[in-house]
Amino acid sequence: MPSCTTPTYGVSTQLESQSSESPSRSSVMTPTSLDGDNSPRKRFPIIDNVPADRWPSTRRDGWSSVRAPPPARLTLSTNNRHIMSPISSAYSQTPNSLLSPAMFNPKSRSIFSPTLPATPMSYGKSSMDKSLFSPTATEPIEVEATVEYLADLVKEKKHLTLFPHMFSNVERLLDDEIGRVRVALFQTEFPRVELPEPAGDMISITEKIYVPKNEYPDYNFVGRILGPRGMTAKQLEQDTGCKIMVRGKGSMRDKSKESAHRGKANWEHLEDDLHVLVQCEDTENRVHIKLQAALEQVKKLLIPAPEGTDELKRKQLMELAIINGTYRPMKSPNPARVMTAVPLLSPTPLRSSGPVLMSPTPGSGLPSTTFGGSILSPTLTASNLLGSNVFDYSLLSPSMFDSFSSLQLASDLTFPKYPTTTSFVNSFPGLFTSASSFANQTNTNVSPSGASPSASSVNNTSF
């Protein structure tokens, strides 16, 4: 009969099963003194074997190929290891980027490094393929170009002027975005011409086009050609490759400065009539083509468009309003909200020839059970109404307005939409009075039975 005794697995059993040629694992892992070394320090014995970088590394499906760094207490500094050495000793071949202190210091964070993966401790297969900040991982976000968006950008740029030379990168990004949105919204499509290959010497030619100021004395040709802040003229110069300048009488906005410069050197053009000067510099086979294209576009701008059909003027005015910060987007009114005129409560009692007499008893005109009998007599003076604590904030509940709307004051009367709570309270002050104030006011306002109401108990109050 086999014995049911559990075999003992002790140290003696393991030592007997080992051969004499191979040392035991306990003897390899136990620090021993070296021969001829009197130093009390202990170290592992060095046994030459296959280098650790040639060991086949096991790869698990779904795990990253970069091994996790070992704990500091298990890392060995020697390069020669025994085959029975701890597994953690093979981690000395880990790249330096994974063992750097900045990698595991929570106070320092690396945004992007070519040798450092963006997700070093992730366990996905594609963690080493691309970085979170690589061009393949992120795509540029295009915002829809609208007039409201451009107005917000210009407003933010004006706010940045309060902090000069502090947000240079933000200002540069804002300028680029403003230019992109402006081109998408207000860029005038000037046709481009096909030019031959440059050949010959560089020459410069100039042409002058007079503005029909006498035929259209009230038309603003200068503003139409230049545009807001000179944007239209700059765009025309960029598309045609020619320089566009407005010269002559009336070309300067400041008339006093124009009269002061008239007759001086380099200001001879002020003696001439208002005109547009087009200048082009290029090779002989290209300069005339570019100049002719620029002259055609300027002549089109000098033809006034009928009122209300000038699309270029509309864009220029809208762009100017955005630059000046005076642009207001057109919003359609909300038809669901109707503004009703509500009379406000007068702070002083109104004087009238005859008093308004109403029943002083509570609940005679309106049912008192709706608001707990807190309806006041309309004969209450305005001074007492404003001076006492007549507003009960406990009544401001969602069911209050529903209860009030349920009161059928008239068959064809609908509950109006009050714009504010104050207008509602001022319209119906009797509904916002506590029971204590109602009792005090009842004692002072109600006259004894059989006696005529006195002048002190009846006041003229308009609701």
Swiss-Prot record:
Q: What is the effect of changing V181A?
A: Moderate decrease in monomer stability
Single GO molecular-function term? mRNA binding
Q: Where is the composition biased (Polar residues)?
A: 1-10
- Region annotated Disordered sits at 1-76, 443-463
Which GO terms of type biological process are on file?
Answer: meiotic cell cycle; negative regulation of gene expression; negative regulation of nuclear-transcribed mRNA catabolic process, nonsense-mediated decay; negative regulation of translation; oocyte fate determination; oogenesis; positive regulation of female gonad development; positive regulation of oocyte development
The annotated consequence of V170A reads:
No effect on homodimer stability
Task: Kindly state the tissue distribution recorded for this protein.
Answer: Expressed in proximal and distal oocytes in female worms but is eliminated from proximal oocytes following mating.
Record protein name field: Female germline-specific tumor suppressor gld-1
Q: Which organism is it from?
A: Caenorhabditis elegans
Query: In the UniProt record, what gene is named as encoding this protein?
Result: gld-1
